[in-house]
């Protein structure tokens, strides 16, 4: 009896020790996994670091590439396209002008009424239409005929107060967001289609001539006064209300910048010098690349798997299309190596681009004590229903690292433009005002990003220059901006 009791006690003690060891091992396993997650975060943070010294190197590299791109075609990663816009709006324009904005599967037609000197925009309205899929792969004639038909409908429905005086044509600004080789303010040949369009017989043709032909067929008495890109349109929209606007930056799905350059500082410009002495340059800065950019293994992997490997590197670390995807890639590694979402890797986390930047922004801005928004987003998008508060905090930290790097690099890019314009040091007469027209959903809606960008540029310019920089939100460059460029490049401008 005694032996049995002793045996039972021994077995019981051994079992208790085994359970305790298991619990201990589990705890140690959890803590070592958490240490791994923190190590991945720390390494990522270090590789994304953007100290002021590095940002100044990026800005200098941007300036060097700008010089090279202005010197010759193909001389730089930056295309530095001549926009042929040498007359930006002054705010004195008056009359009724139109815009056609073709940027993807939808297009818009706008009518804008301007009030003349200090009158601003009196009236604006627009109509939107989607392009049937068969016309995206059909013929040039069919596509432009469809667009002209919608334009005709829009004009037919307008009130008499918008009719032009006898003998005067309506004037239109045409925003065409596809790669073109611009040949004048109102002509340009299509280089290639993107965004799901594939109409071979338009390639190499002047898109303004194609639209004009279609408008004549529909008996629309309208001329295209300006063929523009949305970034140049943003610059025009900003200048209309503020004469100090000289730079425009779009930070949305993609990113681009345009600025006002002295015509004499463009060696590749062989035409007559414009009366204004100025020319707007469309930088196409998304393609900027430099050894100073802080790229990580996640960026390289994302680039390799993209449709355009090796291209648009700056865009891939700064713009809305990609920030959420970078976050997803880091979270996936943490899930695989540190089990931050449990033993199994959530299957949805393996889907490229499932985590969009608006969702990342919502998580980054979550101020609730239990980070409820983060929990909801993880559950709704990735089907992760049991995230711990510790893990949610980790997610917010990652959002901050990704957004901060992007915003600070965008600020460095703007500093590069300011340097190229020679406005980065104070003049004897005091600092010159630099107004940057900003547009795009990323800038407009991701507050932490835009706040970081603005603070960084002020920091980089230094105290003396900090008061000279102003950011202005200029909405709808591709619509209103195009109509304003039609106004400032009107053939009737001398008649007013």
Swiss-Prot record:
Membrane-traversing stretches: 4-24
Residues in Hexokinase domain copies: 35-487
Subcellular location as annotated: Plastid, Chloroplast outer membrane
EC class name: transferase
Gene Ontology molecular-function annotations: ATP binding; D-glucose binding; fructokinase activity; glucokinase activity
InterPro entries xref list: ATPase_NBD, Hexokinase, Hexokinase_BS, Hexokinase_C, Hexokinase_N
Catalytic activity: a D-hexose + ATP = a D-hexose 6-phosphate + ADP + H(+); D-fructose + ATP = D-fructose 6-phosphate + ADP + H(+); D-glucose + ATP = D-glucose 6-phosphate + ADP + H(+)
GO CC annotations, alphabetized: chloroplast outer membrane; cytosol; mitochondrion
Single GO BP term: glycolytic process
SUPFAM superfamilies: Actin-like ATPase domain
Keywords: ATP-binding, Chloroplast, Glycolysis, Kinase, Membrane, Nucleotide-binding, Plastid, Plastid outer membrane, Transferase, Transmembrane, Transmembrane helix
UniProt membrane topology term: Single-pass membrane protein
A Pfam family: Hexokinase_1
Signal sequence, renumbered to the chain: none
Protein role: Fructose and glucose phosphorylating enzyme. May be involved in the phosphorylation of glucose during the export from plastids to cytosol. Seems neither to be involved in cell sugar sensing nor in carbohydrate metabolism in tuber.
Name of the protein described by the UniProt record: Hexokinase-2
